[in-house]
UniProtKB/Swiss-Prot annotation:
Keywords: Metal-binding, Ribonucleoprotein, Ribosomal protein, RNA-binding, rRNA-binding, Zinc. It comes from Geobacillus kaustophilus (strain HTA426). GO terms for molecular function: rRNA binding; structural constituent of ribosome; zinc ion binding. The lineage of its organism: Bacteria, Bacillati, Bacillota, Bacilli, Bacillales. Binds 16S rRNA, required for the assembly of 30S particles and may also be responsible for determining the conformation of the 16S rRNA at the A site. The keyword RNA-binding applies. This is Small ribosomal subunit protein uS14. Zn(2+) binds at residues 24, 27, 40, 43.
C-alpha cells in the first residue's frame, strides 16, 4: 500500500497542471496505472478475474 500522506497529497489540485500524476484509486500505487480504469495492473487483473470489470475478458488466440 502507498503512504497515506502521498495519497492525500495526490488528491489535492496541484498548483501547476503538469505536476498531476496518476495513482491507482484502489491501492494508491503510482506506477503502471491504466488511465481509463484508474487502476494499477495488479488491481486491474484481480478485478478482471473476479468479473467485476464489465466488458473485460481474458484474451486467447
Amino acid at each position: 500500500m502507498a503512504k497515506k500522506s502521498m495519497i492525500a497529497k495526490q488528491k489535492r489540485t496541484p498548483k501547476f497542471k503538469v505536476r498531476a500524476y496518476t495513482r491507482c484509486e484502489r491501492c494508491g500505487r503510482p506506477h503502471s496505472v491504466y488511465r481509463k480504469f484508474k487502476l494499477c495492473r495488479i488491481c486491474f487483473r484481480e478485478l478482471a478475474y473476479k468479473g467485476q470489470l464489465p466488458g473485460i475478458k481474458k484474451a486467447s488466440w
